[in-house]
Amino acid sequence: MARKLEGKIAIVTGGTTGIGLATAKRFATEGARVFVTGRRQGELDAAVAAIGPRATGIKADSANLNELNRLCERIKTEAGRIDVLFVNAGGGSMLPLGSIIEEQYDDTFGRNVKGALFTVQKALPLLVDGASVILTGSNVSIKGTPAFSVYSASKAAVRNFARSWTLDLKSRGIRVNVISPGPIKTPGLVDLAGPDAAQQQSLLDTMASTVPLGRVGDPDEVAGAAVFLASSDASFIAGTELFVDGGQAQI
């Protein structure tokens, strides 16, 4: 059976854990050469070892424009082009309105909005016509979530990027889409509950109770959706948002 990404050059930002790592593994399994980025060298080395020989790790902070420039220069030198760009780096923390501070706002929007914007902008000269750009959103962007307003607003911005950039890039046939996960069992999610294992499990159980399918998702389930959007199977899909959330956003 033919592999869906045979011979493609794929970039996964934030590819050292969770959804990013699972997606990088799937891209490699489907035949792509995968460049993964991360901010910590130890995690990056471990991710490359887990993905296998088709992976290359590049230390880069997506919110730092100088590091993005270096990232793209290296990809230009080593691969010459980008067929698939998965903009996954980001994150956030929970604070109610009265406790939000400037540093939290700047960090969240810096990673999720500024980072996404300039990652795609810097990659434009390397993106082939007809490339697939996939942005990681979140289903909280379309609903109210207590103590999560900054993160939710940042992901609403990401959702609009896909709409607007689809028009900006239509002459090149570049498809820009958003994957919006619901509760997925990743380190980033469980860490919201703090270091206590019982509290982490309580958070997962609470979130599972709000999902029509009755559970939280697995990173590999999001990775499967990313493979679909990256491949020719999604050749007529652009500017859209694919929810991978067990139906949570639909109720």
Feature locations, PLM:
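Short C-terminal tail/terminal secondary-structure segment
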Residues: 143, 227, 238-251
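Short, small/polar-rich loop/turn modules that mediate ligand/substrate recognition or access, typified
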Residues: 170, 175, 237-239
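Residue(s) in the substrate-gating loop at a strand-loop-helix junction
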Residues: 138
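Active-site helix of classical SDR
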Residues: 120, 154, 162
